[in-house]
Amino acid sequence: MSNRIEITKDFYKAFADGNRDFIEEHLAEDFTFSSPPDPHLDRAGYFRRCWPGAGKGGQFEFTRLIESGDEVIVTYEAQQGENTGRNTEILTFDGDKIRKVEVYFGWNVI
């Protein structure tokens, strides 16, 4: 398994655990985050908008982890309370740093 795949898995675990130090260490300075409600957040915007959801004990079950060039494509199922949802995200790397995350929302898993 590649180092980028391992970093990606650890990135999601760090988010679930609320480990901001790991996240800070692995984001590029010019990091951007985009999702349908939050297109093109910068690093500070990511922490302002997304970090309040970290450390809530949610778990990610990966159904797809594919490395292609500088990208890792991730599909996961995650629980939030009683609901389980499925999303796909594309993480773009610059070396071992995550430079960009693009989120594509999925659906609830029944």
List the model feature ranges, each with a label.
Residues 9-13:
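Amphipathic alpha-helical repeat scaffolds
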Residues 34-36, 47-110:
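A beta-strand edge to alpha-helix "cap/lid" segment located at domain peripheries
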Residues 1-3, 109-110:
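Basic/polar N-terminal segments that are highly enriched at the extreme N-terminus
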Residues 6-7, 57:
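Short, conserved clusters of charged catalytic residues that mark active-site
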Residues 17-34:
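Short, well-ordered alpha-helical segments enriched in acidic and aromatic residues
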Residues 14, 18, 93:
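Residue-level signal for short amphipathic helical patches enriched in basic/charged
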Residues 42-43:
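PAS/Per-ARNT-Sim sensory domains
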Residues 39:
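Short, catalytically relevant binding-site loops at active-site mouths
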